[in-house]
């Protein structure tokens, strides 16, 4: 009898797991793959070229529907798992419980949203997945002004892509120079000048106090009452491990779900 393997999350990690199992033990597992997104595995690293128009979604698909079907994987895309019942060894999803013998949690990370007034207004998005990218592309078709909060790599890629699509872009960064985790001040200065030559306005040592608007976003309030008009606000201020399922299942959790050298959780 095959081992019932349930995998939560259809990102690059779980994709590599399935590839390895197909290579080493193709008949050993009956695999069910859940993903909160309504699609399978694609290369998130390449979302920025999709935003800028250099690539399309089809170009960055890692495993398409035919690949999953050919390998006998049952796909439950667009259906997030809401609960893990460790005692009964089932996962609870929208359509009901699914039993498992082995469970792999590969939920990845979620974007961090700064806790300011107006963060939930329409027109305020994070930059994490294809839906976020498509929302930015749709906004850019209308033109207007975009404010990107965060001057790290992801934020600058968002800014460059939106500028490439014709938006007037400002970057708001809390620290003294851009990409401070990767660059020293001198290199950050050169990067800033390059972005400014592309028409992107940079605000460093700038703290977001609130996001303004009534029915949708209209601007970003910085310190000293400076307001940047905005038709679109993109938050790119980092990520946090997605651990809520593990916490709810009373697995050991620290900065992420705690595992040993064999990637086994506290419920091996």
Model segments located where?
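Glycine-centered tight beta-turn/hairpin loop motif at sheet-sheet or coil-to-beta transitions
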Residues: 93-96, 223-225
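Rossmann-like dinucleotide-binding cores of NAD(P)H-dependent redox enzymes
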Residues: 61, 145, 155-212
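Glycine-rich dinucleotide-binding loop and its adjacent helix/turn
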Residues: 107-165, 259
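Short hydrophobic core segments
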Residues: 8, 81, 98-108, 228-238
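FAD-site-proximal beta/loop scaffold in flavoenzymes
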Residues: 120-143, 215-221, 227-268
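Residue-level detector of alpha-helix initiation sites
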Residues: 12-16, 38, 109-111, 131, ...
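A conserved short coil-to-beta-strand element within the FAD-binding core of flavoproteins
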Residues: 77-89, 204-216
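Beta1-alpha1 glycine-rich phosphate/pyrophosphate-binding loop at the start
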Residues: 1-74, 161-183
């Amino acid at each position: 009898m095959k081992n019932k393997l349930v995998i939560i999350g259809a990102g690059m990690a779980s994709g590599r797991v399935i590839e390895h199992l197909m290579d080493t033990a193709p008949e050993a597992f009956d695999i069910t793959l859940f993903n909160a997104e309504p699609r399978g595995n694609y290369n998130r690293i390449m979302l920025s070229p999709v935003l800028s128009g250099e690539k399309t979604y089809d170009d960055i698909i890692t495993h398409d529907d035919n690949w999953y079907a050919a390998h006998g994987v049952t796909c439950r895309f667009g259906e997030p798992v809401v609960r893990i019942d460790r005692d009964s060894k089932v996962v609870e999803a929208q359509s009901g419980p699914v039993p498992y013998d082995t469970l792999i949690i590969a939920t990845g990370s979620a974007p961090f949203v700064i806790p300011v007034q107006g963060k939930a207004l329409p027109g305020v998005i994070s930059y994490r997945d294809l839906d976020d990218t498509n929302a930015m592309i749709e906004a850019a078709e209308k033109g207007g002004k975009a404010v990107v909060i965060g001057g790290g790599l992801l934020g600058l890629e968002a800014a460059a892509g939106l500028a490439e699509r014709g938006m007037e872009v400002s970057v708001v960064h809390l620290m003294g120079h851009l990409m401070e985790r990767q660059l020293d001040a001198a290199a950050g200065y050169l990067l800033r000048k390059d972005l400014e030559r592309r028409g992107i306005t940079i605000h460093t040592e700038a703290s977001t106090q609130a996001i303004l608007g009534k029915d949708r976003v209209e601007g970003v309030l910085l310190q000293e009452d400076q307001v940047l008009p905005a038709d679109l606000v993109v938050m790119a201020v980092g990520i946090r491990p997605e651990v809520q399922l593990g916490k709810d299942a009373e697995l050991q959790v620290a900065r992420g779900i705690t595992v040993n050298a064999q990637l086994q959780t506290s419920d091996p």
